[in-house]
Amino acid sequence: MAGIGFELKRLFRRKGLFATMRAYGYAGIVCTGPMLLGVLLQVGILVLCGLWGVGRANQDLLVCMVTYTLLASLTLTSFFSMPVTRFLADMLFAEREDEILPSFWGSNAIMLVAGTVLYGIFLLFSGATLLQGLLCLWLFNIMIVNWNGTSYLTAIKDYRGILCSFAAAIGVACLCALAALALGLPPVEGLLASIALGYGVMLAWDVVLLYRYFPQSDRSPWLYLRWLDQFMPLALTGLFTNLGLFAHLVIIWAGPIGVQVKGLFYGAPYHDVPALIAFLTILVTSVNFVVSVEVNFYPRYRDYYSLFNDGGVVGDIVVAEEEMLATLNRELRFCALKQLFVTAAVISLETTVLSALPLGFNNLMHGYFRTLCVGYGLYAVGNTVLLILLYFTDYKGAVLASGLFAGVAGLATAVSLLLSQQFYGFGFLLGAAVFFIVALLRLDTYTANLPYRILSQQPIVATDKTGWFTELGRVLDRVEQRYEDKRVGGEPRSAFERMVVRLYQKHWGGSDDR
């Protein structure tokens, strides 16, 4: 992300209000694409539903199905996202670009198979109709490829291409939704298909961008699986962070204010709407991290580590460390202050602004919104500190902080269900506070003796960690090689093909007629 941050930084050098708004718009979309796209699509579709007079029950079911599909796809990809990003960075550093596209399709294949089985089982018992279930599964698979592609797209630094695919997805989805409503199609099914088509356009656009920048090759698509074993803490960090961010929503659905929409599809409008709007307040920190914290910190970080790699003297290393940590402390302080100002401003104005909107906010919802604004603000700053921990390869600290975030947020939210409804948002707030404090303390202790961490905590002999994922990659390589050998040799591969060959040989061909 630092690379694309430098590209976006050029936009911020342009003067004028419009140029500044344009720069923040680019940065916001690039940095928070998945969730922001989900929010904007849902809002756009709901506006069309309101204008067309779609029933409230159908609107609620549509929102639940899209929300479930969005959260399920983000949770699955969160386990693979960081190791895949690390694999991508390593391949680019080693100038092995021919490994990138095969790994993209290999990672997609693993996630699509696992996700289709798991989410398909849920949909089977969810109470959705066959068509609704198939549409949800279709949308789920498209989302997986999109979220996985986001990791690869940041490497090409084409923020305009990302923006165009983003805008095309929203435009196509809204146009298809309008056409479905005008044709009188069933609203839930028609709008689900429209959203899937919108995400499908984004998928096709992103794949074209990837094929434009990376070479095609016949390298193994399963090489990246070794990185899952090698960097399992990264996978767990991504998963725990995602669980901490979204688990409280699911737990609230099972509480007293939860509403059963249909079958296993639940919602809690009094809590979900404030949470959705409060989540948008972290955009400032997400954008600031990419265009300010990383852009200003990374050059100092690079210079410091280059002194170790290129034989720098002790005096230069000490000076470079002081400059790097001073820059880091300054940027983190500014980042926290910006988030504090945004959170305070939003809380101050929310009663006036939200009451004027047709969202049906009551006193309980206003309370949830204020609580969740503080919680998401703490999460945003804590996540920034977590990413800096990953810069210093403190994977254990990252797993500890994210694991406590997921555990405390989930457990505290479950306990809050036993209390008055006014306290429901405090579970997530407590988890976010623990996340922020633990990550900050870990960063402080880790950087207090940085040369020791770099020189003395590394293994003397480099070893490759192998495990279940590495073995899975080897098995898939053997299967693929066997398949390819049969294809080249002309032998039928499947039972269906063998049956066709037997029928052909019996009635029309000879034994040597391949």
Describe each region flagged by the PLM.
Residues L153-A179, L389-L411:
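Alpha-helical transmembrane segments of multi-pass membrane transporters/permeases
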Residues S194-G198, M202-E294:
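Transmembrane helical elements of multi-pass membrane transporters/channels
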Residues M1-Q42, D60, C64, L225-L234, ...:
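N-terminal membrane topogenesis motif
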Residues V63-A89, N242, F246, A275-R300:
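Small-residue-rich midsections of specific transmembrane alpha-helices
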Residues S165-Y211, Q422-T445:
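Hydrophobic alpha-helical transmembrane segments
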Residues T20-L36, L163, S220-A247, L332-F341:
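Hydrophobic faces of transmembrane alpha-helices in multi-pass small-molecule transporters and flippases
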Residues T67-A72, N108-L112, I121-L153, V342-E350, ...:
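Alpha-helical transmembrane segments of multi-pass membrane proteins
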Residues L92-F104, D272-A356:
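Specific pore-lining/lateral-gate transmembrane helices of multi-pass inner-membrane transport
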